[in-house]
Amino acid sequence: MSRRTLFGLFVPLVLVAAYFGVTSSIRAHVDDLIQHAVDKPLPDFQLVDRDGKTWSKQDLVGKRSVLHFFRSYCHSCDVEAPAIRALEQRADADTVWLHVMTDVVLDVDESKTEETIARKQYSAPVLMADEAFMELFHQAQWSQVTPITYVVDREGTVRFGLRGLQTEAAVEAALAAVQG
């Protein structure tokens, strides 16, 4: 085999290996950030939902809560939306669902944001994450990859950080684990 042929075979293999190495490293970093949030108190935050109500950590104390981060241009967010809708509609009275949309800080066009919210058809409040909110979560070294679902106990401690596309069963299991 000529040197040119060997080089032509070797370079693509190196590039593929580098790609998988980098993506694995990024995934591991994000997973570490998510796990960093578990067993930590929910940061003190204030965000306004689309109906004008201001929500804070204090509104969640005494109830189980689910903070579901999503955005436009997120395929996994679209795929999981029916399961998330079903879960929020079946939620117990002691469970608060809040959807946190990150479009504003990502400079997504407002019409696309409106289209995404209409398509999702969530019945629980949708909060629009602002720079201050995102900075608060960055300071706490949390991940805001989307989709991500944080399940919080009645004392305000995060018990689960569920990364990526979630099934009804996975979220139900997390909620059941923080039943007490």
Regions found by a protein language model. Give the residues of each.
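Short active-site neighborhood of thiol/selenol oxidoreductases, capturing the structured segment around
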Residues: 55-78
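Short loop/turn microsegments at loop-to-beta-strand junctions
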Residues: 42-43, 65, 146-147
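Short histidine/acidic/glycine/proline-rich micro-motifs that form metal-
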Residues: 16-19, 73-75, 101-106
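Thiol/disulfide oxidoreductase modules built on the thioredoxin-like
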Residues: 120-122, 129-177
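Hydrophobic beta-strand anchors of alpha/beta hydrolase catalytic cores
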Residues: 66-67, 97, 149
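N-terminal targeting signals for export/organelle localization
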Residues: 1-44, 180
